[in-house]
Amino acid sequence: MSADLGPLAITRRSSSELIRAKGETVGRLGDFWSWACSDLANNTMRGVLAEYLVAMALGAAIGTRTEWDTVDIRTPEKWRVEVKSAAYLQSWAQPQMSKIEFGIAPASGWDAQTGTASVEVMRRSDVYVFCLLHHQDKQTLDPLNLDQWTFYVLPTRILDERCPTQRSIRLSSLVERLSPLKTDFAGLPKTVSACTEGMRQPEGSGLNPLQ
């Protein structure tokens, strides 16, 4: 057994890799992905998809996702981005549409390179992106249609100042109390940039600060 138990070097896969048994091909990685990841409306996969959408918009989707990292996304500009997602519709039967709530709890950080956790509980990002799959017709729900998403962007310092120990926040409270910037997918780069620089864009910039 190798004495090296450090982190694996994860390389990005293409989906065409073979699944083998005794030298015989029994499937492909893409088959597994289709089997495991096709339900994009459940909480787990929707959350991962939301991270990917934000990373893609910010030019940070190169490489692979790190599970349980201290922040969800690190951009080429060195911005640290935390991504949260919510939706009115779920893949299971619902008596009513879900109430929209996002997790904002400070947390201890975990380092994948060392396998150790920090005892300090805090929010480590520069900015939060709250991703709302706002579509409300179950028959036409499609998480891959980015017109069905709305994004709210907020500097982390505002959460630290206004909600220092709060663990979750309703959409109504987020909008009314904290005034995040609201944008569509195309506007994410400018909106995140504005928030990381601690600025609100001037009127007519194409961004929509909520009142």
Residue ranges of model-derived segments:
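Nucleic-acid endonuclease domains
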Residues: 1-79, 83-211
